Structures are given as structure tokens and as C-alpha cells.
Amino acid sequence: MQKLAAFLKRFHSGPAADACEFLGCHTREDGEGFVFRVWAPHAQSISVVGDFNFWNTEDLPMQKISEGVWEAVSVYAKTGQAYKYCVTGPDGRIVYKTDPYANRCCALPDTSSMIDPPDGFEWHDALYRARTAKQSAIKRPVNIYEVHAGSWKRHEDGSYLNYEELAAELVPYVKDMGYTHIELLPIMEYPYDPSWGYQITCYFAPTHRYGTPKQLMQFVDTCHKAGIGVILDWVPAHFPKDENGLFEFDGTCCYELSDPMMNEHPDWMTRIYDYGKPEVQSFLISNVCYWLRYFHVDGIRVDAVASMLYLDYNRRQFKPNKFGGRENLEAIEFLRRLNEAAFQANPAVMMIAEESTAFPLITKPDYDGGLGFLFKWNMGWMNDMLQYMSLDPLWRKGDHNALTFSMTYALSLIHIS
């Protein structure tokens, strides 16, 4: 109880990098059943429904144990069973929600969470991790193969390769081609099959499309034994408005900003996180630490950083910050805390910003006024190179500046091209 009380204090004052160790579904200390905890500060009531209670909304009501954290215990719940939270909002409307901290999700169209604790996998990558821990990635050769697991290769019937099949075919290919890392486009659970996975509905659950969480761990283990690092694309800039997801989780704007002028992304029609809330910071930061700890990933590429940094990003109207500027001060502070927590979890981690503007000091440490990333994705060089190669060869001689322009800013930050 003392550990829980200490966590709740950290969670509400923020950020708590270990939030995933307390929230979600966890095995009870005595090993009998599971405890469920969820953050929903404005909910009238919540109950846990699932296979273990025949989805009876009155069988397992949750109790509020702090400012917005609810808890329930079931001795009947078992690994592999599905569950959801039945949330009654302040207006009395009832919505069935996926657990934000769920470690696994059921196969679509079922949007239920599944009980599946992430521990218990036997790793064989100690030598690889010891070797990479000795030297920063800045001083090591890096050659990254970016891949979408669902479209790199498929079976003849169009079905996806699972993680075991990907490991058997992708890892030897990457090794033979001289790459040092595989970067996976988002493999967290997402709702729309034809997409690349950038609208995430469950951040702690690997998508069901390619196998189980343990099979993803096996994929990473196979990569490491072959000397290949694994980087994950990660999306803290926005989330979709699927009713079962984070969208208005407790019947109000819970994870997202409450201001209707600012809480929706104009390009993607998705919701934007409220980075000023300690509980939201804890959710996102603990998610990165979760992937580093339980899945042994070597790097995190943070997607759409520019959309986080600017309040007027692709907006005609916006509300300036307290100094009258366009910078999102809460997002800037969040990114600093994120990088600090990530490097505490794994000092050798590659924290990469996918940032498309000239925002200063992205790869400088916090104490130098920077954001604390290790690398910035060199989108400028990429766009210039693609533009140059798209020209008719006859006209390229007049556009050689596209090849050299990136050299004017190359030394201001640490780039990955």
C-alpha cells in the first residue's frame, strides 16, 4: 500500500515514469487474480466487465482510490481473458473503453483488452546489450532500414507475416544488406488496417496483426542476436477519436486539451494531448520506458514533433502561450522530461526527433536549453534529395544547391540522414 500511495502522489504531480507498473491490469501480489486500475477523474462510476464475469456491468464496480484513479480486484480473472471498462460519464452516458494501459488487445473488430502480463520472457541478448551500452550511438556506425511490418512482404493470400516469419526473412536480409538497425513503423495497436499505424488506440499493446507481445519480444531477441538494433516509431502528438479509445475517456476531455479551438489536429482530425497534465505526461513517458524495459528496443523515433512544438501548426487561429508566443511551452517541457526519463531507463537509447522545422537546440541537453534528443531526423536533406532526383537529368545541373544546402545547417544539430 505504501508503494501505491507513493506512486499516486508522483502520478498526480508528475511525471511518473513507472505508471504502467500500477495502472492497467496486474497480477495481485499473492498471485490470486488481478487488480485493475484506471485514471478517469470525471467519471460518475466505472465497472470492469469481461469474460470472467460474463460482461455483467454490476459484478465488479471500481472504487475511487485517489483524485481520479479507480481500482477493482477480481480473483476470477485469468490470463488470456478479454475485458473492458464500462465508464459512466458526468452526463450519465455509458461508454465501453479499452484499457489505456492494456498490454494486449483482441483481434479486430473486437476492441476489448486482453489480460496478458508482459513479464516472463526469457531473453538471450545480454551480449548485444552489454556491447551497445559501452558506447553512445553517436560514436557507432548507424544504417537504418525503415520498414512497415504489414507490407514489407505478405503471404500469397494477402495475409500478414507474423513476427516469427518476419524474423526468419527480414533479419537475414537486413544483415546481408549491411544495415545496423531496423526501424518499425508503429506496431502499437491501431484501428484501420490499410493505414501505417500512426493513429494509435492502445499504446502499450503491440498490434494483434503480427502476433502476440511475447512473439514481438522474440523478434527483438532474434534481431539482437544477429547484431541488429530495433527502433520503434512512436506517436505522442495526437490520437484518434475512436469511441473505445482515449477520446473523451471519462466523458470529458481527459487525455486531450479541453479548449475546442486547440484540441483537434486540423490535418488529421485527431485529438491533441494535454501535455500540461501530470497524468498525461506519466502515461506517455511510462509508455516509452515500457518499450525500453519489457521489449528491449534500442531507439524511439518520436513522430510529428513540429506539430507538438507550435501552437499555430497548420492553424489559421490559435491561442498564444502566456508570453504571447506561438511555442507550445507544455509540449516543450514534456519532451525534455520524456528524454530525461528515457535516458535514465536506458543510457544507450537512441531518442530521435522527426521534426520538420528549424526549431533550435533539439539535440542539445536540457541544461543547455535544448530538448534532449540524441538525433534529429534529417527531413530537409531527404526532401531536397527527392526533389533533386525528381528533376529531368537535363535540368539537374541548375539545381545542385539542393544537394549542398543541408551542409549549411548540418553541424548545428546531430542529424540522422
For each predicted feature, which ranges?
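Short proline/glycine-enriched turn/loop motifs at strand-loop junctions of beta-rich domains
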Residues: W39-I46
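Short, acidic Ser/Thr/Gly-rich low-complexity loop/linker segments typical of extracellular
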Residues: T57-E67, K376, D384
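Substrate-binding/active-site clefts of carbohydrate-active enzymes
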Residues: A126-P141, H148-E327
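Conserved alpha/beta catalytic core and glycan-binding cleft of carbohydrate-active enzymes
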Residues: H296-D298, Y313-S417
